[in-house]
Curated annotation (Swiss-Prot):
This is Cytochrome c oxidase subunit 8A, mitochondrial. The keyword Transit peptide applies. Its main location: mitochondrion. It comes from Rattus norvegicus. It holds the Pfam family COX8.
C-alpha cells in the first residue's frame, strides 16, 4: 500500500502541473497624499487595540475560564 501512494499522488497532481494560470497585470498609481506619522500611529494603535488587546485579556484570564463554578 505504501509503495502505491507516491504513484497515486503523482498521477493526481500531474495534470495540475501542466495547467497555465494567467497572472493579472495589476498596476497602481502613487498615493494622492502621503500619510503622516500621526496617521500611521493612530492606525497602528487602533489595530492593536481592536485585535491584540481582547486576545491578551482572554489569555491573561485563562485560569478563570478553566475553573468550573
Amino acid at each position: 500500500m505504501s509503495s502505491l501512494t507516491p504513484l497515486l499522488l503523482r498521477s493526481l497532481t500531474g495534470p495540475a502541473r501542466r495547467l497555465m494560470v494567467p497572472r493579472a497585470q495589476v498596476h497602481s498609481k502613487p498615493p494622492r497624499e502621503q500619510l503622516g506619522v500621526l496617521d500611521i500611529t493612530i492606525g497602528l494603535t487602533s489595530c492593536f487595540v481592536c485585535c491584540l488587546l481582547p486576545a491578551g485579556w482572554v489569555l491573561s484570564h485563562l485560569e478563570s475560564y478553566k475553573k468550573r463554578e
